[in-house]
């Protein structure tokens, strides 16, 4: 299934916000707003089981401290799977923090955080989740920033059996989002608005019991995302981002995990 630059009316449904989420330009643009009373959100009409899903986002300019804009994949229930992009706002002139996480069978605690090498409030930038049976890759403008591999052979759960929808939201998290909750939301600057456009899903659509990628006689080249991996050039780029822009990595936080780091942290 390919939703190329998709009409956002067709691809998404607004799920909450009482008018604070709006679709404009005949389905070409979607905005989410937050004020003191409420945030807002939307989700995809389709569920997916593997794919390469991207959207362009322009984040809140100026003083966005305390606010969080999200874009993520998630299934439902207490043992849900989830793949997260969260954008943690900051005071004027300070950088956004891009927060990533992977949940499998209801367990997360796999946070990696990054600063960006550009101002994400000045223009739209493309944020992509690649999810196939072998790996999850987070991309920013086609630059890979994180890879989470399938290490089930080592007993580490991997999201590969639960279909997920795309979700996005704009909400207040000033109890933790900015400097651990020290900087609160300045409601005199409300409403805070993030903009979304150019959604694209090259993905296997899940409909109840079957996947659109399931037929044995279909051409596997049509589902190129199922085997996508990082070549040497992109691996070099990934290492560059992680060396220069990563600001938190759960795999080195022994204070937080005194009983031992997650097992995947010790597997190269």
Swiss-Prot record:
It catalyses: breaks a beta-(1->4) bond in the backbone of a xyloglucan and transfers the xyloglucanyl segment on to O-4 of the non-reducing terminal glucose residue of an acceptor, which can be a xyloglucan or an oligosaccharide of xyloglucan. Optimum pH is between 5-6. Activity decreases sharply when the pH is lowered from 5 to 4. One of its GO terms (biological process) is fruit ripening. It is an enzyme of class 2 (transferase). Expressed at a very high level in flowers and stems (picked at anthesis), and at a lower level in ripe leaves and fruits. Glycans are attached at residue 90. It is found in: Cytoplasm. Disulfide bonds join 204-213, 251-265. Keywords: Cell wall biogenesis/degradation, Cytoplasm, Disulfide bond, Fruit ripening, Glycoprotein, Glycosidase, Glycosyltransferase, Hydrolase, Transferase. The active site is at residues 82, 86. InterPro entries: Beta-glucanase/XTH, Beta_glucanase, ConA-like_dom_sf, GH16, GH16_AS, XET_C, XTH. Residues 1-196 form the GH16 domain. GO terms for cellular component: apoplast; cytoplasm. Induction: In fruits, up-regulated by gibberellic acid (GA3) or by cold treatment during storage. The keyword rRNA processing does not apply. Xyloglucan binds at residues 86, 99-101, 109-111, 175-176, 180, 256. Its EC number is 2.4.1.207. The record marks 84 as: Important for catalytic activity. Catalyzes xyloglucan endotransglycosylation (XET). Cleaves and religates xyloglucan polymers. Does not catalyze xyloglucan endohydrolysis (XEH). Probably involved in cell wall assembly and synthesis in fast growing tissues and in the maintenance of firmness in mature fruits. This is Xyloglucan endotransglucosylase protein 7. It comes from Diospyros kaki (Kaki persimmon).
